[in-house]
Amino acid sequence: MHRQSVVRLSRQLGAFPLVELPPPYLAPSLHFPLNRSSVQTSNFSSTAPAAGHGKDLNKSRAVSAIHRTGPRFKLGASKYPLPKPVSPEKLEKRESTPDHGLWGFFPKDRSALSTPEYDNAHGRSWSIQELREKSWEDLHSLWWVCLKEKNRIATSNLERKRLKAGYGEWEANQRLRTIRVTQLNIKHVLRERWYAWEDAQNLYKKGYRPQNEDTEESA
């Protein structure tokens, strides 16, 4: 049966009972709803098509401190006066501080890059026996001298890498190795003193007194 005739009969007779309908595989059009809903379905996006054509009243739109994004339109800088550049000849000459602490990151001649002769002019590292005779203040001062020298070598290596000088790297590494051996020996001596102090503390807790041995020897 043609679909138009089915629609005409359904309007005249109302609706077909489900009992009088043939099976769906014989007449599938009879089992579909004939009266479709007049409700309009929305698209995938519920935003109006003309929403982006109007003026954006949100001043903070697209402003993100994380992504460093600014507003969607250019802003004028006429509200704040811009500083005018000053000629270098009119600037006051500032004298550098001769004893500034940052000069410790550079060689004695205050050059940006140390020469291989300067890095190669060093002695041997401090031995453990020599460091055992030093006081705590001497070890502390020597440690900071080594640390300061390591920072100076790191500054020269960074400048050498930036300039692509191609020389002085081997001499700087040899000097750095000597400094590291000295620092390892300082740690070894301090570790020995810590263990000695810990053993003396344990003996004192057990009742050991050095003056008792002196009394027994004199008797």
From Swiss-Prot:
Pfam families: MRP-L47 (PF06984)
Domain of life per record: Eukaryota
InterPro entries, per the entry: MRP-L47_sf, Ribosomal_uL29_mit
Biased composition (Basic and acidic residues): 87-97
One Gene Ontology term, aspect cellular component: mitochondrial large ribosomal subunit
Subunit annotation: Component of the mitochondrial large ribosomal subunit. Mature mitochondrial ribosomes consist of a small (37S) and a large (54S) subunit. The 37S subunit contains at least 33 different proteins and 1 molecule of RNA (15S). The 54S subunit contains at least 45 different proteins and 1 molecule of RNA (21S).
PANTHER family with a match to the protein in the record: LARGE RIBOSOMAL SUBUNIT PROTEIN UL29M (PTHR21183:SF18), RIBOSOMAL PROTEIN L47, MITOCHONDRIAL-RELATED (PTHR21183)
Record protein name field: Large ribosomal subunit protein uL29m
Organism: Emericella nidulans (strain FGSC A4 / ATCC 38163 / CBS 112.46 / NRRL 194 / M139) (Aspergillus nidulans)
